[in-house]
Amino acid sequence: MKKEKLRIENISFQYPGAATYALKDVSFSLYEGEWVSIIGQNGSGKSTLAKLLNGLFLPEAGTITVNDTMVLSEETVWDVRKQIGMVFQNPDNQFVGTTVQDDVVFGLENIGMPREQMIERLEQALQLVRMEDFLNDEPHSLSGGQKQRVAIAGVLALQPSILILDEATSMLDPQGRREVVETVRQLVTQKGITVLSITHDLEEAAQSDRVIILNKGEILEEGTPEKIFKSSHMLQEIGLDVPFSVKIAELLKRNEILLQNTHLTMESLVNELWRLHSKK
């Protein structure tokens, strides 16, 4: 059985002066080597959840537990932040070094890590995100996707238990989004890194292992991407869309082209269409 890395139990939070709760009785767990996506329209509670996980706010009720032992509180917030690494929305706002290597080692320098160990962590982190060839590059020479991969490397160098992506692809072009999503998938499948992605990008969510839908501060549904995106009517009712490949597959089925699988990527859909065509 996989180790539980993060446990959210019955958390609720209400902003001062607000008439309703931003989050109400939310519970879920995140396990080692798992990639979970949280989706929902604006006002669903996604941003509030990110702030709670980072310790910017504390829940009014319920608990947040990391590694089965550490409960988030005013006393433990700094220890929890060492275990949870966050990558945010704007890649330019996260780049603090004059070169890629300066940026990645920034956090390591702040904790006084010995130089030899720092160099080892730097090399490992850049290899994980496939940016080792850009060691001395300046930020202005990098694409948005490359900057986010460097931001991920900076977090990984600190070796947190959990990587949280807070709308980390929302300001990127399609190529940049693909780069980051491919990097995250490799980190999960090849290195067993645990990832929580808070996103409005359904193409990104479709690549994760599990999807949780937040709606008006509560969990509406939870399951595999295949299960979630089959319910296109439910998603549309709460203001969400479905991945483009799912839309195309539904149109094909209406035209009596019988597909065997749920397709979350265009590549998967094209492959099945090719197989069907080859049988004719």
From Swiss-Prot:
ATP binds at residues 40-47. The keyword Signal does not apply. One of its GO terms (cellular component) is ATP-binding cassette (ABC) transporter complex. It is found in: Cell membrane. It comes from the Bacteria. Keywords: ATP-binding, Cell membrane, Membrane, Nucleotide-binding, Translocase, Transport. ATP-binding (A) component of a common energy-coupling factor (ECF) ABC-transporter complex. Unlike classic ABC transporters this ECF transporter provides the energy necessary to transport a number of different substrates. One of its GO terms (molecular function) is ATP binding. Its main location: membrane. Residues 6-241 form the ABC transporter domain. Belongs to the ABC transporter superfamily. Energy-coupling factor EcfA family. This is Energy-coupling factor transporter ATP-binding protein EcfA1.
